[in-house]
Each structure stands twice: as C-alpha cells, then as structure tokens.
Amino acid sequence: MNSIMLISDLDHSFDEIALQTKQKSHSYGRRLYTLTQGQKKYWLKFHVEQHNQVLEDSFNAELEFYRQNKISSSDFLVPYRVIDLSKLNFLNEMRQSGEGLFTLDTNDFFIKFSPENDLHEIRKQILLALNALEALHQSGWIHGDLKSEHFRRYLDTCRLIDFEQSQRVISPKKLLTATPHYMAPELFHGQPKSVQSDLYAFGIILYEWLCQSRLSAKTYHDWAILHCQQLQIKLPDSLQCFLPILDGLLKKKIDERFGSVTELRNAIRTINLL
C-alpha cells in the first residue's frame, strides 16, 4: 500500500495545534507544527518564502523528493501528504501560500535497550533499519543527512524521514550540507555524498546506539579531526560480536568501507551470536 493513501482522509480541522519551531529556525522562515486530530498526531513542516533561500531550497528539494517517490515503492517512508497551505484554516490569518508536508507522528526507532536484550534481538533491530536504508538506495536516492532521529518506528517496521539533503545516487552534488557529527571523512575533503557516506553515518548511529552514549566535539574542525584521524571504536564485552560490522562501516577510506547495504547485510548474517 502506498503510504500517501494512509492519511488521505486527513481533515483540515484539528483538536490541538502547537508551534514547535526552534527560535533560530523560526527567524529564518521555517515552521514546524504538531497537530492532533482524534487519536492521531501529525507534524506539519513548511517554509515561509523570502526569508532564507538556502532553507527554502532545502525544503523545496524535500517536497520534490516526495513527489518523485509518490508512485514508486514507499516502504521506507512514514505516511505523509503534501498539502496546499491555503486550505489550512489556522494559517488563514497568516495568508500563507505554497505547500507543506504532513507526516504521521512516529516513535524513535533507536531507543535505549536494556542489558537483558539478547543479541538476536539487537541484530533484528539493525536489519530492520537496513531494510529502510536499502529501499531508499534501491529507489535511486542517497539520504545525505542521516541521524538517529531520522529512523522512525512505524508499526513493526523502520521508516526514514527528513529528506531535505537527499540526492540522486547517479548525480550527487559536492555540497557541504551534512551534519558534522555524522559526516564521513571524505566529505570533510569536499568529496560528493554517496551510498558509502550514508553507510558511514549509519555506522556512527549504530555505534552510539550500541554504546548508549554519544560522540562529542565542540567545533566543525574538532569533528573533522575526530572522523578523519582520531575515531576509535570500542564496544562492551557483551557486544564484541558487532565490532567487525562497525569496522566495515567506519573505515576512513571510502574504498575500504562496505559498498552497499547488501554487503553489510551479508556480513551481519555471518555474525556468531553464541
């Protein structure tokens, strides 16, 4: 079933509306709302024209991503709908034009796990996340800005959100628009994004999830030093079986890194969990 059909019955009246935009983003023209309708909660994102061209272009790129994936398989997307903002009553007084993006509210996928979680369950979670990432790549797209919060739980599956920095696999652009926390070493050297840079970001996400802690650095330069020179992977003794996977995801040289989700998935299936 195409995800867009799942919220095709969306009414334009809501029980609760709350502005969630951070102050700095708001000043740049970005708007992010949560809206409830009955038992369902949605997110609405749009950009006010002529405030910040870079952010406006990024949002328009995300809308175009959804338009191009409307007919194709959407197994990696949360239920969504692109909507004419002029039809939303609560925006009438703002005289807001253009289009906005509705997405169904979903839970974080990479939540904290307890020590009681067995290794088979952890591997299952990783493979579910890879299903979404593989579907994205097979549709011909690179996410370009993967973060832990972009992996969402929908029913019994993992889905992806936030495609403002997405690019075509066959024609990536040399744009420094990723988040330094998750940037592959080659991106700091001006190389274009790729499937492998998505996999590197996934490696950082996976590493932090397994360790239940986050990497830290203060400046862009500090992140560059960390990813290009200083990153060392250590796992708790109970999770050592996943070390070869992280090693293959976080190779500093792109030609030594896993080349595809399929290659990564095959490596995961060889892990001895005994």
Question: PLM ranges: what are they?
Answer:
Residues 78-98:
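Short beta-strand micro-motifs within the conserved protein kinase catalytic domain, predominantly
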Residues 198:
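Conserved catalytic-loop aspartate of Hanks-type protein kinases
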Residues 28-67:
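ATP-binding glycine-rich loop module of kinase domains
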Residues 173-186:
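Conserved activation segment of eukaryotic-like protein kinases, specifically the C-terminal portion
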Residues 238-252:
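Conserved C-terminal C-lobe helix
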Residues 125-126:
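Activation segment signature within eukaryotic-like protein kinase domains
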Residues 137-153:
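Catalytic-loop of the protein kinase fold
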